[in-house]
Amino acid sequence: MTTIDLNCDLGESFGAYKMGNDDEILPFVSSINVACGFHAGDPSVMRQTVEKAMQHNVAIGAHPGFPDLIGFGRRNMNVPASEVYDYVLYQIGALDGFVKAAGGKMHHVKPHGALYNMAATNPEIADAIAKAIYHINPSLLLYGLANSEAFIQAAEKYNITLVQEAFADRTYKQDGTLTSRTEENALIKNEEEAIKQVLQMVKEGYVNSVNGQKVAVQAQTICLHGDGEKAVQFARRIYRTFENNEISICTPK
């Protein structure tokens, strides 16, 4: 039977601001990425998200981003790799504290937004992220964009397990990278198209680029976004689609 991990970014509320559909999404995913306070989230939200994830037996990962709350971590920052290392180490350590306090064990690290996209094409950024993981806990998995040589090489250098990720509701360029969110066609808004794309990636190992070309994708985890208007409905549909197609949802080891 084909197996796949379903992951989702959660814990993005902070202070008086409520974001996402965390409680409703949790039953349909096998791993989550928790915002660590830089691009979203706050200490109380981090604790609550960890506790809820443990109740659902969902794998917990850190979701470090740039210190850009106003831009939700989606804006590139021109900082040296040494600062990226510091940012990532700091955020992993913060979440790990909450996970340990709740009696759990952290599973992975997935960079957020601009940090993720920069790492996918910039070996120095990817190296800084992998090095931070290695220094704090080399058993943590690294979630990174499928086919990214930067992620692959960084994981190999530090002997970290890379979990190659694809996206259910994002479009792809011909080189296998994600279409920038600044482009109108960055998101797949039609639910049927997104379901079709996910099945193609999981069952057939490819995705159609925005130019209509087939791009090979060997995905081990699929990212769902939990903050959209129909996010819960979409998560439920993907979950049931996988069941109907004999695709087992499970956490990567």
UniProtKB/Swiss-Prot annotation:
Superkingdom, natural source: Bacteria
Matching SUPFAM superfamilies: Glycoside hydrolase/deacetylase
Catalytically driven reaction(s): 5-oxo-L-proline + ATP + 2 H2O = L-glutamate + ADP + phosphate + H(+)
Enzyme nomenclature, EC number: 3.5.2.9
One of the GO BP terms on file: carbohydrate metabolic process
Keywords: ATP-binding, Hydrolase, Nucleotide-binding
UniProt cross-references to InterPro entries, sorted A to Z: Glyco_hydro/deAcase_b/a-brl, LamB/YcsF/PxpA-like
Pfam families: LamB_YcsF
MF term (GO), any: 5-oxoprolinase (ATP-hydrolyzing) activity
Top-level class of the enzyme under EC nomenclature: hydrolase
Subunit structure: Forms a complex composed of PxpA, PxpB and PxpC.
Family: Belongs to the LamB/PxpA family.
Role this protein plays: Catalyzes the cleavage of 5-oxoproline to form L-glutamate coupled to the hydrolysis of ATP to ADP and inorganic phosphate.
HAMAP family on file: PxpA
Name of the protein in its database record: 5-oxoprolinase subunit A
